[in-house]
Amino acid sequence: MALRPSKCYREINKPAYTRKKYIRAVPQPKVVHYVNGNKGGDFPVEVHLVVKDDIQIRHNALESARIVGNKYTQNKCGRLGYKFQIRVYPHQVLRENKMASGAGADRISDGMRLSFGKAVGTAARVRKGQKIITISTTPENVIHAKEALRRCNMKMPVKCKIVIGKGAELVKN
């Protein structure tokens, strides 16, 4: 069955459901690497992508943002000129009670009986002001880090802002 739209899971309107003991099979998150680039490098400047609202971000949105941001940063800064880090983990289990529609659906569907639903994915719960992605780099590459985070922002289901954390005094506006 097709993937439901993100708006179905965006709001935080239920308690966190991270208990995997009662669920038969939870799909693995699509995010494969949480740290990219020069993992051991010590860079003087950090640029963050900060969320403006409380929201759930699905694992496939995090992965697509990682791919876009990492590829752009790697092309502009080189393989060892940056450190790209996703700072949230998708713990929240997303469930879907599939409903049959069409001819004969009443004979197939259970309706609201046993409506716990099957696990269809995971999401990260983030709060307003939380940093979700950080790029550490040199002062010369800050403009590229900002552009990479702007591209990551386009993949997110929420408005975000780009903030320079550590090393703001080294960066020329």
Swiss-Prot record:
PROSITE patterns in the cross-refs: RIBOSOMAL_L10E (PS01257)
Q: Which Pfam families match?
A: Ribosomal_L16
Gene Ontology molecular function: any one: structural constituent of ribosome
Q: Could you name the domain of life of the organism this protein comes from?
A: Archaea
Keyword hit for Ribosomal protein = yes
Per the record, the GO terms for biological process are:
translation
Entry-linked InterPro entries: Ribosomal_uL16, Ribosomal_uL16_arc, Ribosomal_uL16_CS_euk_arc, Ribosomal_uL16_dom, Ribosomal_uL16_euk_arch, Ribosomal_uL16_sf
| Keyword annotations of the record | Ribonucleoprotein, Ribosomal protein
The GO cellular component terms are:
ribonucleoprotein complex; ribosome
The answer on whether this UniProt entry bears the keyword Secreted reads no
* Family in the record: Belongs to the universal ribosomal protein uL16 family.
PANTHER family in alphabetical order:
60S RIBOSOMAL PROTEIN L10
The protein, known as: Large ribosomal subunit protein uL16
Which gene carries the instructions for this protein? rpl10e
